Amino acid sequence: METYEKIYPDGQITLMAPTGLAAKRMTESCERPAKTIHKTLGLVPADTPSGFEAPGDGQKLAGGLIIVDEFSMVGIHLANFLIDATDCTPGTHIVFVGDVDQLPSVTPGAILRDLIDCGKVHVTRLTKNYRQASGSMIADVAVKVNTGNTRDLHFSKDCVFTEVPENAIVQSVIDEFTKSVGEYGFDNTYVITPTHKSDKDQLSSNMLNKKLQEIINPPVEGRLDAVSGERHFRVGDRVINKKNATDVINGDIGKVVEVISEDVGATLKIDFSGEIIEFPPERLKNLELAYAITVHSSQGCEFKSVIMPISYSHRFMLTRNLVYTAITRAKVKMNLIGNKNAMLASVLNTKTGGVSDLLCARLAAQ
């Protein structure tokens, strides 16, 4: 950006990311304002394959330097909105930043990988790690996992593997969470798990959230809860939005700051990265607790302390890129808890998932 401003002192710089937390982190690291792609382009929720539409002609990007972070999360629909909105006149430069080895987009298209593989786009690989401190074992373990090197995979110091029996994983995760909250603070401590809603899986984010809320933020007599189905939301709870809307997108994480009694139910005021958004009773169904989140939901985020259960029961879901994605969310401390053999097997499981497209072949043919 500094180089661009020297060459084009009057040029415009636009910073974007797929999620609110990723945009917030981009703002902090670049010391310049960044927004979500959706907000920058003026996209609104719609019953379309992408889940969004650009009303009218939508927002247009006035060229200049456009930088999009965490681009591995972007699928073909969102990428199409972005390119359509860009003024591709001389002097316009688009930089896509992302880690192609993380989990692919949950929507169709592996755009970042296709752009790299097509041979038509200039690619720069960044090799210096800025997230973890120099000498961090988190970075070392992440590299070993990403290259499939189980022989030299060692844990110590700030990246720890605690091997416990399967029936002790849940309690060990809870114990480590409470310990980590005391050391790093609640806002900086997350459990990241492979599974989401299964009530039969005690290590799903749904089940872990119930247990962690009971310990960290239990009910208090005389204090109002907002209730949606079996979920109770209280002041201080960390929550994740699960449905796109005009003011918040799927995957945005916030904290409940107020519960307001209504004639029917209660309204929540939630702080999403500094923006207070109200969720009336009819929107509560779109919220879930976020003491524990899935690996997919953690993409684009970084946390001081991350705890991840590794269970043999998840063996078909534990892939190299899933574990690599989870480990690289941790900035200061990474705790993996569970079955060591399941961990080693995940490093050798190179199944990537995702929905393929023909973009790479079409670009290569140009």
Where are these regions (language model features)?
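ASCE P-loop NTPase helicase motor core
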Residues: 1-156
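Structural motif
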Residues: 65-69, 190-192, 240, 307-309
